[in-house]
Amino acid sequence: MEVLATDTASQQERLQAIAEKRRKQAEIESKRRQLEDDRRQLQYLKSKALRERWLLEGTPSSASEGDEDMRKQMQEDEQKARGLEESITRLEKEIDVLEFGESAPAASKENSAAPSPGRPQSASPAKEEQKSETLVNAQQTPLGTPKENRTSTPVRSPGGSTMMKAAMYSVEITVEKDKVTGETRVLSSTTVLPRDPLPQGVKVYEDETKVVHAVDGIAENGIQPLSSSEVDELIHKADEVTLSEAGSTAGPAEPRGLAEDVTRTTPSRREITGVEAQPGEATSGPPGIQPGQEPPVTMVFMGYQNVEDEAETKKVLGLQDTIKAELVVIEDAATPREPAPLNGSAAELPATKEENQTGPTTTPSDTQDLDMKKPRCRCCSVM
């Protein structure tokens, strides 16, 4: 009977401990959600105050009614921001007390004070128990879960010694943040090997599986801790950027290969000198051209040259089997010849009298008058 009573009492104590632990976890989760909401609202108020201050700096010195209202609104926002900062500090302390017990504030005070060189520091039992439980949970995390900037983080073992938790990999994410709207945009994401020693940056987030450091832009943007929801959203955006980059690099590979195949299968174009294309022809082939079909070619000639194969040229130009017309002139031997024109064109011959034609003979003066009335043709001859 005593054994049964002891078992019943131990079981009740165990159930009470489990219920108390669940209650603490639920309270911690509630306070964490409230803490994240306060941080988000504080960030919004800071961005709003920065934008309003920038607008007020651009206005002239003469204050108007709208400027006064804006300044009053800025003062109210600053008061709200101070209240949110106090609330955030209080919630963080309450969460520390719930997680590590009543000894957490005392331990933080001891850590803030200068330690004596002769006395080694020993962690409290509640903190050691919590850290050991954190280590077990970190080891049970599946390998496929997304992580970001996971670095070597010291974890205290139950014996009080510091043990390094090895990082599996590290991710470098380049982020651009809009100061007006507060929206975060991921520019690039690169997976690298975990770096040892730790990166030269400021720690802005840490939990059982992830540690986030702000490396660049600290002087411009300031140090702002991140919440778990913001870290998860950042990891999700980084995964989307990585997938989009992989798709953009793998997409154009297939059309390039098809273009190379078409180039190989297309026969070489035959060039015929002296052929002019039609005015309606295009400089490139149609978009739906099939391999093996020769697209139209447009050629523009800025001069001429002698062709070696004259027969082929006549055949192409349609001059084969044509009749050449010759000019036959019958004249008297006494008619003076005029010099040939300089441009090589055929000279205009004066009208002569045929042998069996009857009529008055022409005098030299009449011939000169005829030449003056009828000017000589100096047009160019083609072909």
Swiss-Prot record:
Sites bearing Phosphothreonine, chain numbering: 141, 145, 153, 242, 361-363, 367
Residue numbers bearing the Phosphoserine modification: 116, 122, 124, 157, 161, 244, 345, 365
Residue segments, region Disordered: 51-163, 242-295, 334-375
Family: Belongs to the paralemmin family.
Membrane topology summary: Lipid-anchor
Source organism: Mus musculus
Primary localization: membrane
Bias type Low complexity, positions: 285-295
Residues found modified as N-acetylmethionine: 1
Residues of the propeptide: 381-383
Compositional bias segments (type: Polar residues): 109-124, 133-143, 357-367
Protein name: Paralemmin-1
Lipidation (S-farnesyl cysteine): 380
